């Protein structure tokens, strides 16, 4: 589970999906560029929110977390924020929505399972990412 969860570190899998899709779909490259930039924005905004909120990661009755983390801060979950920003943005850009949202939900849930996030951290990150994804959708419609 820890290996699977690592796919979401710093939004890596979502950035890779966007960059590869943009490389393959030349006509849609500007759309993929905007969608991929949205994943990066989600990560940056999430990092700023963590520094403001400063919520510590869970410590469950002396049980060790099953995965390492880059920081001791937990709210909101960057895995969830980048995952839902990616799923929302890329499904609007032309990729199939169901597998994207399944991957986003699985990566997000893995963080709770591994003991590095509270469920509310994941929910907060998912809402942040989805809100940014909706913003991108409005931009697509406006062009």
Role assignments for model-derived ranges:
Residues 9, 24-26, 53-54, 115-118:
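Short helix-capping/hinge motifs at transmembrane helix termini and TM-loop junctions
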Residues 37-42, 46, 50, 125, ...:
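Alpha-helical transmembrane segments in multi-pass membrane proteins
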Residues 20-44:
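Interfacial segments of alpha-helical transmembrane regions
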Residues 1-14, 46-73:
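N-terminal transmembrane-helix/juxtamembrane module of multi-pass inner/ER membrane proteins
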Residues 21, 45-54, 91, 133-141:
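Membrane-water interface at transmembrane helix exits
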């Amino acid at each position: 589970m820890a290996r699977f969860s690592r796919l979401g570190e710093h939004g890596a899998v979502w950035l890779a999906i966007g960059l590869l899709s943009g490389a393959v779909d030349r006509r849609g490259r500007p759309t993929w560029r905007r969608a991929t930039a949205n994943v990066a924005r989600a990560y940056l905004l999430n990092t700023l929110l963590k520094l403001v909120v400063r919520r510590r990661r869970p410590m469950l009755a002396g049980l060790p977390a099953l995965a390492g983390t880059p920081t001791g801060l937990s709210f909101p979950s960057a895995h969830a924020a980048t995952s839902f920003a990616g799923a929302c943005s890329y499904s609007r850009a032309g990729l199939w929505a169901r597998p994207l949202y399944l991957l986003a939900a699985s990566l997000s849930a893995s963080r709770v399972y591994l003991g590095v996030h509270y469920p509310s951290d994941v929910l907060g990150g998912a809402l942040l990412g989805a809100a940014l994804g909706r913003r991108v959708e409005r931009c697509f419609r406006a062009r």
